[in-house]
Amino acid sequence: MGKAQPLPILITGGGRRIGLALAWHFINQKQPVIISYRTHYPAIDGLINAGAQCIQADFSTNDGVMAFADEVLKSTHGLRAILHNASAWMAEKPGTSLTDVLACMMQIHVNTPYLLNHALERLLRGHGHAASDIIHFTDYVVERGSDKHIAYAASKAALDNMTRSFARKLAPEVKVNSIAPSLILFNEHDDAEYRQQALNKSLMKTAPGEKEVIDLVDYLLTSCFVTGRSFPLDGGRHLR
């Protein structure tokens, strides 16, 4: 008999940056991948051509979240993991509705993973002890807070707390952990002055790139014991 096809890994926000790097990492390992994307970047076509299932989704409403969950449920009988990478970033600033900022941040960072974890729970169960994973991507600001991005920090803190709650709910079949990055990689338009200021905020004074995240994700997926924990990726920034 042939070897059974691995269950897919679901990555939200898989069309660019860290989500895209994770998708290609798994594809190169012959691991089936399902990604969500909101905007059709050129990279999406490359993923489709490589065999990834790419589902356009709008997580700005609960109906959009559940419509995406329905598509996943129709496409697979099980999941190896869910990586909650989809994110948004809004600051409190003059002229911006504070209620809109808070609602947007809570919708993408709290409502979306909360609803998806419940809706897709049965796809994660039934595969054995510690055989499935959920990984929430939070942020360095969970511990420190942010005076300029209060709603963003609060929503990521809520997601961090949900990590422990879902770990209790889903053990021992499913491990649930979070990764809390600070600066991982720059945007192309970031100027030299900004880059240097950002690098100086950590002890390691470098932007490590996607591989640092990929290596930690691989560790969490491989572990048969670690659950309910948050893993900072901040280069010692908390010691500055």
Swiss-Prot record:
GO terms (molecular function) for this protein are: dihydrofolate reductase activity
Q: Does the keyword Oxidoreductase apply?
A: yes
Q: Do you know which Pfam families this protein is assigned to?
A: adh_short_C2
Recorded catalytic activity of this chain's protein: (6S)-5,6,7,8-tetrahydrofolate + NADP(+) = 7,8-dihydrofolate + NADPH + H(+); 7,8-dihydromonapterin + NADPH + H(+) = 5,6,7,8-tetrahydromonapterin + NADP(+)
User: What keywords sit in the KW lines?
Assistant: NADP, One-carbon metabolism, Oxidoreductase
SUPFAM superfamilies in the cross-refs: NAD(P)-binding Rossmann-fold domains
- The coiled-coil regions, if any, are none
Q: What class of enzyme is it?
A: oxidoreductase
On whether Iron is a keyword of this UniProt record, the answer is: no
Catalytic residues in the record: Y152 (proton acceptor)
EC annotation? 1.5.1.50, 1.5.1.3
Xref: NCBIfam families: PRK06483.1
What function does this protein fulfil? Catalyzes the reduction of dihydromonapterin to tetrahydromonapterin. Also has lower activity with dihydrofolate.
Per the record, the similarity remark reads: Belongs to the short-chain dehydrogenases/reductases (SDR) family. FolM subfamily.
Question: What is the designated name of this protein?
Answer: Dihydromonapterin reductase
Species of origin reads Escherichia coli (strain SMS-3-5 / SECEC)
Gene behind this protein: folM
